[in-house]
Regions:
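Conserved mixed alpha/beta catalytic, RNA-binding, or beta-rich assembly cores of soluble enzyme
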Residues: 1, 7-9, 38, 89-93, ...
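Fold-independent oxyanion-binding glycine-rich loops
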Residues: 18-21, 41, 62-65, 106, ...
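N-terminal glycine-rich phosphate/adenylate-binding segment common to multiple enzyme folds
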Residues: 44-114
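Short secondary-structure transition/capping segments
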Residues: 61-73, 104-112, 156-166, 200-206, ...
């Protein structure tokens, strides 16, 4: 929603291609019927056709598709089935990379997913004003583990505690990882979110929003380190304010 609002504020006309049971109803309602198409996850042919009908010069991937859709609830059309069959490995990078190739084959430029969100990126240093209750040694350990997980295409985050890895993010997503980490019921745990060294910023850019913050609170985690300028904070000011009220420290690192 922030992308659409910020683009419109800049005088850029915006159209929506949303996904049934995935795209927020309030976002869909921002667009009249003539300026939106709602399709099922996996209907790549319909998506490409909609981009052509809208005469799009640029496209931007925003939001998230529930990870389980890859295994259950996927409705691949012929185009999507062909792509999935051609992939030796099926992860976010390979799947979205293949979709990006199809989009750009239409002469459409796929934008950096951080476009129109300059003021929503993680900032360097403390974002909540709290002193960060994790030593540099253990912070650097968490950053190293998160970056290695990202490099190996496992995921973009991890939870560590004093040099011990409690959980790593895999295909189930951040919230499920945080729930698993919370099962240890220990203090001084640190959640780290990063990007790949060779991140393709057209898709799968890590995000941190109120839902993630709520998952941290439920799991009893009080510290999060986010790569500055890379991780998107969805509704940044609200997230920071809520983090302060819950006593959760947010730190941006580079």
């Amino acid at each position: 929603m922030l992308v659409a609002e910020n683009a419109r504020s800049a005088g850029i006309p915006v159209r929506l291609i949303g996904f049934d049971e995935e795209t927020a109803p309030e976002l869909i309602e921002l667009f009249p019927e003539s300026e939106r198409r709602i399709i099922k996850v996996g209907q790549l042919g319909k998506m490409l056709k909609a981009l052509t009908v809208f005469d799009s010069g640029y496209a931007l991937m925003a939001g998230q598709i529930t990870p389980r859709r890859l295994f259950k609830g996927l409705h691949p059309d012929i185009k999507a089935a062909q792509i999935l069959f051609s992939l030796k490995r099926r992860n976010a990078e390979t799947i979205f990379g293949a979709i990006a190739t199809e989009i750009e084959a239409l002469g459409i430029t796929l934008l950096d997913a951080r476009s129109f969100l300059d003021n929503q990126l993680a900032s360097l240093g403390s974002m909540t004003g709290h002193s960060f209750p994790v030593s540099d040694e253990y912070l650097f350990h968490g950053i190293h583990i998160a970056r290695e997980c990202a490099r190996l295409d496992i995921g973009q985050g991890c939870v560590v505690r004093k040099g011990t890895v409690l959980a790593v993010e895999a295909f189930e997503g951040t919230d499920e990882m945080l729930r698993r980490a919370g099962n240890f019921k220990t203090d001084e745990s640190l959640f780290v979110k990063t990007v790949k060294t060779q991140q393709d910023y057209r898709f799968d850019v890590p995000c941190f929003g109120l839902r993630t913050l709520e998952s941290m609170k439920e799991a009893g985690l009080k510290c999060a380190a986010l790569e500055s300028g890379k991780v998107i904070l969805i509704d940044k000011s609200t997230v920071i304010e809520q983090a302060r009220s819950w006593g959760i420290s947010l730190l941006g690192f580079e």
